[in-house]
Amino acid sequence: MLSPDLPDSAWNTRLLCRVMLCLLGAGSVAAGVIQSPRHLIKEKRETATLKCYPIPRHDTVYWYQQGPGQDPQFLISFYEKMQSDKGSIPDRFSAQQFSDYHSELNMSSLELGDSALYFCASSL
């Protein structure tokens, strides 16, 4: 919906200055991985936290980022609450796994280039 206070060109420019973060498979799907929030739009330089609840009894969590028109990029993984592998995760991002095995991906100082699909997976 367009803002009545801004001409179309100004609205488009303002929209381009926002960062859109989406999670694949957000919500509950037949006892699979649960991710939240489903989608998120933030301003540049803001922070965001994405949550991943693994399949019950799975103790390993993997985070991925997929930018527009790109292949998924591995960010980081955890096994039994410890970081087990690190991929191309920006310094502005951090992640952790908690005692109930859910994980959070924290992103600070968001940039337009962070606009992407974020998803997590779990395994035994």
From Swiss-Prot:
Main location: membrane
GO (cellular component) term, any one: plasma membrane
Signal peptide feature range: 1-31
A family per Pfam: V-set
Listed transmembrane segments: none
Residue positions with a glycan: N106
Domain Ig-like residues, every copy: 32-124
GO biological process: adaptive immune response; cell surface receptor signaling pathway
Alphabetical list of InterPro entries matching this protein: Ig-like_dom (IPR007110), Ig-like_dom_sf (IPR036179), Ig-like_fold (IPR013783), Ig_V-set (IPR013106), TCR_beta_variable (IPR050413)
Compartment(s): Cell membrane
Cystine connections: C52-C120
UniProt keyword annotations, A-Z: Adaptive immunity, Cell membrane, Disulfide bond, Glycoprotein, Immunity, Immunoglobulin domain, Membrane, Receptor, Signal, T cell receptor
Assembly, per entry: Alpha-beta TR is a heterodimer composed of an alpha and beta chain; disulfide-linked. The alpha-beta TR is associated with the transmembrane signaling CD3 coreceptor proteins to form the TR-CD3 (TcR or TCR). The assembly of alpha-beta TR heterodimers with CD3 occurs in the endoplasmic reticulum where a single alpha-beta TR heterodimer associates with one CD3D-CD3E heterodimer, one CD3G-CD3E heterodimer and one CD247 homodimer forming a stable octameric structure. CD3D-CD3E and CD3G-CD3E heterodimers preferentially associate with TR alpha and TR beta chains, respectively.
Record's function text: V region of the variable domain of T cell receptor (TR) beta chain that participates in the antigen recognition. Alpha-beta T cell receptors are antigen specific receptors which are essential to the immune response and are present on the cell surface of T lymphocytes. Recognize peptide-major histocompatibility (MH) (pMH) complexes that are displayed by antigen presenting cells (APC), a prerequisite for efficient T cell adaptive immunity against pathogens.
Name of the protein in its database record: T cell receptor beta variable 13
Species annotation: Homo sapiens (Human)
Lineage: Eukaryota, Metazoa, Chordata, Craniata, Vertebrata
